[in-house]
A protein has these predicted regions:
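Acidic, metal-coordinating helix/loop segments flanking the phosphotransfer/catalytic sites
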Residues: 43-60
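Alpha4 helix (beta4-alpha4-beta5 surface) of REC/receiver domains from two-component response regulators
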Residues: 94-110
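CheY-like receiver
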Residues: 132-140
Length: 140
């Protein structure tokens, strides 16, 4: 079992800059004492997300389920089927009732809106721990 590195990379995708800022602020620079310091990668389009994930090095991807024109849940499902080393994927959902859609997307975890800092940091920290301790992420 390996420990989380001192520096981790978290991608946040939303077409809305304010949503990306809310996520970054809620999760913070280090979501828990035992996780690495986050290097944030922001993406405003699905093409940017695809390019970043193809490049590799992303530990956790946070995808806005309400993003336009391509929502994060569809992207999550696509990545789970297409990427051999898919990072942990967290989907941001606007309604708790959309939890079934997040399950369909094969997301590893969800963050509900309104974005709550303690919950958001805990979700990201757990995914970072899982990523670096060999616990497999959900696969399609």
């Amino acid at each position: 079992m390996s420990k989380v590195p001192d520096q981790v990379t978290v991608l946040v995708y939303s077409n809305l800059p304010e949503v990306r800022a809310q996520i970054r602020t809620a999760v913070g620079r280090r979501p828990a004492p035992d996780t690495g310091r986050i290097d944030w990668v922001e993406c405003a389009t699905n093409a940017e997300v695809v390019a970043q994930l193809d490049e590799g090095g992303i530990d956790v991807a946070i995808l806005d389920g309400e993003a336009q024109p391509t929502g994060g849940m569809g992207l999550a499902r696509q990545f789970k089927f297409e990427l051999d080393d898919c990072p942990a994927i967290v989907v941001l959902i606007a309604r708790r009732q959309d939890g079934w859609l997040a399950s369909w997307s094969l997301a590893d975890a969800v963050i509900n809106t309104p974005i709550e800092p303690v919950e958001s940091a805990a979700v990201v920290a757990e995914q970072l721990r899982r990523r670096h301790t060999g616990i497999p992420v959900v696969r399609g």
